[in-house]
Amino acid sequence: MPPSVATHASLLLKAAAAAAHLHPKPFFSPRAAPPRIPSAPAPPAAGGSRYRPTTTTTAAATATSATAACRWFRWPPPAQAPVRGLCSLPHSGGGGGGGEGMGSEGVGRRRRVVAPAVNGVAKDGAPQPPPPKLLTLPTVLTIGRVAAVPLLISTFYMEGPWAATATTGIFLAAAVTDWLDGYIARKMQLGTPFGAFLDPVADKLMVAATLVLLCTKPLEISLLRDGPWLLTVPAIAIIGREITMSAVREWAASQNTKVLEAVAVNNLGKWKTATQMTALTILLASRDKSLPAQDALVTSGIALLYVSAGLAIWSLVVYMRKIWRILLK
């Protein structure tokens, strides 16, 4: 201890002893010493840390004692040196290193580093579910419908006794696979987000292409010669409805669940699709001039096409009313 400090402390003690004889109560009492550090650490509480106290506790107590001594003897405060302990370990997080650290969990807890799975099995031995397949059987059938659109256009403009039959067969196969891929996806649980996106696109491409083909090259019968607009009006109604519903469903995908439920497929939409596919199949098949009662086939096909257009507009109105009620709430 420096001599000046010792002299100063000795004078303070003598003054305190002299004052004790004059006053019953001492006018000066030194500060209480800091609490002693227990020799053995206390056991951790239930649910607490499972690690024993480290040098951090001892270093903190030493720093507290040094600060109290500096205040007593009016020394300059000691420099705050960095204390190396358990809390000073680097965070493991998601950065480099990959070791275990403290993170933001507090002292005594370790952050678990999850290793990526290799060949479907994690490093800890737990099996991981396989990633979903992109090309399932329903998705392949849907892609086949999209690829059949150029083939349908090619056979429609071909000349020959087999051209009408080939065009009708392609469209009929597309209509059957439209039902088949949904059935397989539900029964075998093979549905994928990509397939759910591509299925309505394939349907609209096939229907729109067929309607445009029938309008650009109408059948040579008396009914269509007198009224060439008979095919144009339902074609515009059906295509316009499909474009509108595609935009509405795209908007509903960004809204809440109630809006999505409002645009779900209903029975009107199913009846519309059934009458639409039947009408287009009849109109494509009636292009074969060898078929008997060609005029009757064309008339029935046009009538079903108008029924399909009416159901399309009706279902669109129903969807819009549901959405409007939800928006007004």
From Swiss-Prot:
Q: What is the lineage of its organism?
A: Eukaryota, Viridiplantae, Streptophyta, Embryophyta, Tracheophyta
Q: Which reaction does it catalyse?
A: a CDP-1,2-diacyl-sn-glycerol + a 1,2-diacyl-sn-glycero-3-phospho-(1'-sn-glycerol) = a cardiolipin + CMP + H(+)
**Origin organism of this chain?**
Oryza sativa subsp. japonica (Rice)
Q: Which domain of life is it from?
A: Eukaryota
Query: How is this protein situated with respect to the membrane?
Result: Multi-pass membrane protein
GO biological process terms, alphabetically, are: glycerophospholipid biosynthetic process
Q: Which residues cross the membrane?
A: 134-154, 156-176, 194-214, 228-248, 298-318
The alphabetized UniProt keywords are: Lipid biosynthesis, Lipid metabolism, Membrane, Mitochondrion, Mitochondrion inner membrane, Phospholipid biosynthesis, Phospholipid metabolism, Transferase, Transit peptide, Transmembrane, Transmembrane helix
Cellular localisation: Mitochondrion inner membrane
Can you say what this protein is called? Cardiolipin synthase (CMP-forming)
Record's keyword annotation contains Nucleotide-binding: no
> What function does the entry list?
Catalyzes the synthesis of cardiolipin (CL) (diphosphatidylglycerol) by specifically transferring a phosphatidyl group from CDP-diacylglycerol to phosphatidylglycerol (PG). CL is a key phospholipid in mitochondrial membranes and plays important roles in maintaining the functional integrity and dynamics of mitochondria under both optimal and stress conditions.
Instruction: Identify the InterPro entries for this entry.
Output: CDP-alcohol_PTase-I (IPR050324), CDP-OH_P_trans (IPR000462), CDP-OH_PTrfase_TM_dom (IPR043130), CDP_ALCOHOL_P_TRANSF_CS (IPR048254), Phosphatidylglycerol_P_synth (IPR004570)
* NCBIfam families, A to Z: pgsA
The record's annotation in Pfam families points to: CDP-OH_P_transf (PF01066)
Listed EC numbers: 2.7.8.41
Q: Where is this region: Disordered?
A: 27-55
